[in-house]
Amino acid sequence: MLSKALNINGETGLLAVIGDPVSHSLSPKMHNLALRHCQLNYCYVALPVKPHNLVRAVQGFAAMGMRGFNATIPHKENLLPLMHTLSEEASHIGAVNTVVIDDDGKMTGHNTDAYGFITGLKEAWRSDLSGLTAIMLGSGGAARAILYGLIQAKAARVIIANRTIERAQALIEAMQPYAPNTQLMVAPTQADQLPLESCDLLINTTSMGLKGETIPYIDLARLPHHAFVSDIVYGAHPTPLLRATAQHQLGGQDGLPMLIHQGAKAFELWTGHSMPVELVEHTLRQ
């Protein structure tokens, strides 16, 4: 049985997640559970950091000897120029969500979001994602990481459906150099413009569903029976999209596995230990 109390002392290391806002984050619960399980003397906290304070905050983290931190909205892109080194994923995606600080205060920026999405998807659906056709709704920061992950997994075709065609096109232009074998396309958010019949994987990267709203231009009845639906929104109850997915007897998952697996990768980068993923997911879903 894990103790619920953190044993903080003079040698306790500090880890954190920064954002604005950040009080809703599940990361402290996830990481502190894993730290206790692995008997590691760290504490993970959520720190609200306004955009105009980002540079000072990051400099302070290095000065005080923090081991590292996560970043969420709105800081992922703005961390790029503050890093001493970037991982290949962070450089290609154009965003940092995990920072490792060495003993000299040097910071390496990583992006574990693509890994988190692909790992969760493989566990829930199928281990080989090569050759698939995916339709992705949205072109924001999460979409950028997920698209990179699909390219690395050798998807054959990814269609980005977005209300603003120009934003989707800009995302494709940014990712095209890394996608020699993946066809990237743009489609408007109109039912008759989406080739759902040939879709293997439907991904919602937008916030639609967070407040219980449906996605009007998606007719799940048009998907083939083998298709899988991934909605990166997560909460106490399934989104309307995932409820409809179950009604159509399709496979699907919410965004919690992505959150957990990106966190597990960050945890390993900081500590060298593996996160107890099953324990964490069971706890977060209670």
Curated annotation (Swiss-Prot):
Assigned GO CC terms: cytosol
Q: Which Pfam families match?
A: SDH_C, Shikimate_DH, Shikimate_dh_N
- Enzyme class, one word? oxidoreductase
Keyword Amino-acid biosynthesis belongs to the record? yes
Identify the residues that bind shikimate.
S25, L26, S27, T72, N97, D113, Y234
Give the binding site residues for NADP(+). Answer: E88, G138, S139, G140, G141, A142, N162, R163, T164, I165, E166, R167, I232, G255
Which InterPro entries does this chain map to? Aminoacid_DH-like_N_sf, NAD(P)-bd_dom_sf, SDH_C, Shikimate_DH, Shikimate_DH-bd_N, Shikimate_DH_fam, Shikm_DH/Glu-tRNA_Rdtase
- What positions does UniProt annotate as the active site of this protein? K76
Annotated EC: 1.1.1.25
Q: Provide the reaction this enzyme catalyses.
A: shikimate + NADP(+) = 3-dehydroshikimate + NADPH + H(+)
What metabolic or biological pathway is this protein involved in? Metabolic intermediate biosynthesis; chorismate biosynthesis; chorismate from D-erythrose 4-phosphate and phosphoenolpyruvate: step 4/7
Q: Which GO terms describe its biological process?
A: amino acid biosynthetic process; aromatic amino acid family biosynthetic process; chorismate biosynthetic process; shikimate metabolic process
A single Gene Ontology MF term assigned here is: NADP binding
Superkingdom of origin: Bacteria
Protein keywords: Amino-acid biosynthesis, Aromatic amino acid biosynthesis, NADP, Oxidoreductase
The UniProt similarity line reads:
Belongs to the shikimate dehydrogenase family.
HAMAP family the UniProt entry points to: Shikimate_DH_AroE
Instruction: Please give the subunit comment from the record.
Output: Homodimer.
Q: What does this protein do?
A: Involved in the biosynthesis of the chorismate, which leads to the biosynthesis of aromatic amino acids. Catalyzes the reversible NADPH linked reduction of 3-dehydroshikimate (DHSA) to yield shikimate (SA).
Classification via NCBIfam families: aroE, PRK00258.2-2
What name is this protein filed under? Shikimate dehydrogenase (NADP(+))
Protein species of origin = Magnetococcus marinus (strain ATCC BAA-1437 / JCM 17883 / MC-1)
Q: Gene encoding this polypeptide?
A: aroE
